[in-house]
């Protein structure tokens, strides 16, 4: 299987299946001398790990990461960083009844046709369990980006039909939904409780923001910063759409509204989401991603078996009724990996570029 590596200078390679013995990652290209501890990685892993609230899967995985290489006496050496997370709470028997069936809207059918072999336990390689390694790798990138003045944060901006207005970053880490509006949390909880009673699932919208990014990141034409961000975010399980800045709303905007006018005091708006011509503008980089509702539910759904016979599928096991609830740290990680890669690429080619034009902020 190809396609397990992301990045050009800062690269992340992952391996492992949902019910295998462990997940692993190789993170290559991190500059030497960065102070790095297990706690730096574990902090974000704890934000993503399952079983932390009644609104997520009850699979109990501690997601304790081990650093196998690339760090010595608390600092990165410049060598490849090896990471490992052991799986400890697999219940593979939950999936024995569907080993010859295809769950609707899952990767079972497409993996079967592509490889002729598949690990049906918990989705195998296609499971969102894989994203634990992305979060661990992204934590390394986030730690380095902080030294460059770049902060990446995310939040849930919609759950099902409930839109969540942004009020404050202070509340995002104080609830299971990563909601920036504390007043919305009771409504979100009630909605999820009813959803579970209905034996159904729902999608979500996540917003992720990078602040402190200087102008100049991004390689125009095929490696545009927004194109690579979209690539990274679309690679997350269940993501079906990505917007940068105003996104699809730009269709109804006139040019006089959409253009982000410049003044000596700063930009007057940020419809471009901090990226112009594929290159960072110095404004906050803003991306939104839409995650579909998981089809791993106990309500019967029509499908076929490996012989083409019609069947009804009921998926047992422990599943997230809304995969978006745990997606915020994953989105942050993928944005961090992209920005880290482009920061190193820009440093390699343009480290000596100096212009007299001031860097504008946003009014």
Curated annotation (Swiss-Prot):
Residues noted as binding NADP(+) in the record, renumbered to the chain: 48, 54
Annotated segments matching region Disordered: 44-63
Pathway(s) the chain acts in: Metabolic intermediate biosynthesis; chorismate biosynthesis; chorismate from D-erythrose 4-phosphate and phosphoenolpyruvate: step 7/7
Keywords, sorted A to Z: Amino-acid biosynthesis, Aromatic amino acid biosynthesis, FAD, Flavoprotein, FMN, Lyase, NADP
Transferase keyword on record: no
Cofactor (UniProt): FMNH2
CDD domains membership: Chorismate_synthase
This protein's name: Chorismate synthase
């Amino acid at each position: 299987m190809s396609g397990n590596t992301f990045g050009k200078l800062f690269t992340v390679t992952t391996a492992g299946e949902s019910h295998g013995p462990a997940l692993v990652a190789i993170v290559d290209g991190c500059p030497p001398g960065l102070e790095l501890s297990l706690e730096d990685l574990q902090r974000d892993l704890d934000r993503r790990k399952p079983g932390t609230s009644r609104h997520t899967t009850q699979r109990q995985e501690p997601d304790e990461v081990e650093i196998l290489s690339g760090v010595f006496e608390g600092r990165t050496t410049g060598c490849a960083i090896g990471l490992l997370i052991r799986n400890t709470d697999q219940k593979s028997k939950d999936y024995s009844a569907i080993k010859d069936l295809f769950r609707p809207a899952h990767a079972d059918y497409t993996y079967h046709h592509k490889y002729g072999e598949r690990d049906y336990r918990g989705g195998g390689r296609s499971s969102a369990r894989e994203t634990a390694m992305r979060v661990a790798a992204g934590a390394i990138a986030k730690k380095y980006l902080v030294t460059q003045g770049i902060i990446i944060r995310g939040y849930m901006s919609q759950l099902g039909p409930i839109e969540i207005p942004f009020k404050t970053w202070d509340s995002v880490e104080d609830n299971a939904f990563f909601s920036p509006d504390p007043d919305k949390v009771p409504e979100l909880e009630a909605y999820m409780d009813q959803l579970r009673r209905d034996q159904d699932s729902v999608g979500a919208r996540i917003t992720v923001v990078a602040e402190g990014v200087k102008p100049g990141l991004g390689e125009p034409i095929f490696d545009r910063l927004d194109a690579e961000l979209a690539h990274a975010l679309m690679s997350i399980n269940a993501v079906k759409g990505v917007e940068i800045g105003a996104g699809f709303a730009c269709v109804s905007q006139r040019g006089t509204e959409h253009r982000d006018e410049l003044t000596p005091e700063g930009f007057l708006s940020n419809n471009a989401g901090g990226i112009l011509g594929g290159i960072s503008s110095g404004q906050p980089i803003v991306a939104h991603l839409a995650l579909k509702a998981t089809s791993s539910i106990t309500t019967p759904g029509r499908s076929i078996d490996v012989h083409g016979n019609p069947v009804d599928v009921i998926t047992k096991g422990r599943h997230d009724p809304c995969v978006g609830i745990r997606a915020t740290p994953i989105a942050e990680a993928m944005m961090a990996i992209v920005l880290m890669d482009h920061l190193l690429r820009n440093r390699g080619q343009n480290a000596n570029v100096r212009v007299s034009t001031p860097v504008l902020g946003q009014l």
